């Protein structure tokens, strides 16, 4: 293999159980949308089943069908909005659906469809969801039309923020949600996402928490200290060469070598998910030695500067650690967003469970 990602099964299970403990042992909804944040939705879902995760969250019907066709028979919730034809198919397949508007409810009634419904309320995200003030009317409509209302949920927009203002806003969202669900007895009531679990575990409402990026050891853009690294992107040295000081490296001649150097080429580029912004400040590890990424990252290749202490010991085919949670945590690059990076891991990168 040229480039691959190793997924640590036991560390993933540890992280899920640790976060479940922090969430006062609430039931876990495993969010495996966007190919489980780039790591492989089917593989991750199968691991989560081993720690008693029985409900999975996806973005759309297509992702739900992918899980079902891979043999995942557990409950699946489409967290995003669905088109009318998707609501029809979801009902046939027994997939739970998020409903955010009266128009969707009226469509279900008009077509005599009765899927498992989770009503979504907008407590401050300003994306999808009913208005909080309409809660009583919407819930009453479901009851009067014998709709199968199994859940109510909302989404925290800034629970990974670290200021007093962001904390207060999150608490306001939780309080709004509390007013909706206070006297309800439903199978699924949920508002807490990963950062909601780690940062607001004393304020968790309901009987379910949604666990996504937290499984992979992150709260927001920072690694959670008590969680374990679960993924490592690795590659191999493809080419090695010694060059003179002042040589330009890669497209655009933006980088000039400050001294006579040894550089190596890795068979991974932005087509594989190694973002171009890592050209400034990014690094990889060879035998625990930090090697700076130099020049613009190319579509299929990346150049690194090899430190003098290992330049005579490396060889073509040597293994390179390109990215793991600790490297991402150490990078001081404003453009870096862990979610964006993970979901951008390309299909050429083989996913391997270890």
UniProtKB/Swiss-Prot annotation:
Substrate binds at residues 127, 299. It catalyses: L-alanine = D-alanine. Keywords: Isomerase, Pyridoxal phosphate. The modification N6-(pyridoxal phosphate)lysine is found at residue 33. GO terms for molecular function: alanine racemase activity; pyridoxal phosphate binding. The active site is at 33 (proton acceptor), 251 (proton acceptor). SMART domains: Ala_racemase_C. CDD domains: PLPDE_III_AR. The keyword Cytoplasm does not apply. Its EC number is 5.1.1.1. It holds the Pfam family Ala_racemase_C. Its cofactor is pyridoxal 5'-phosphate. Pathway: Amino-acid biosynthesis; D-alanine biosynthesis; D-alanine from L-alanine: step 1/1. The keyword Isomerase applies. SUPFAM superfamilies: Alanine racemase C-terminal domain-like, PLP-binding barrel. It is an enzyme of class 5 (isomerase). One of its GO terms (biological process) is D-alanine biosynthetic process. It comes from the Bacteria. One of its GO terms (cellular component) is cytosol. InterPro entries: Ala_racemase, Ala_racemase/Decarboxylase_C, Ala_racemase_C, Ala_racemase_N, Ala_racemase_pyridoxalP-BS, PLP-binding_barrel. Catalyzes the interconversion of L-alanine and D-alanine. May also act on other amino acids. PANTHER family: ALANINE RACEMASE, ALANINE RACEMASE, CATABOLIC-RELATED. Belongs to the alanine racemase family. This is Alanine racemase.
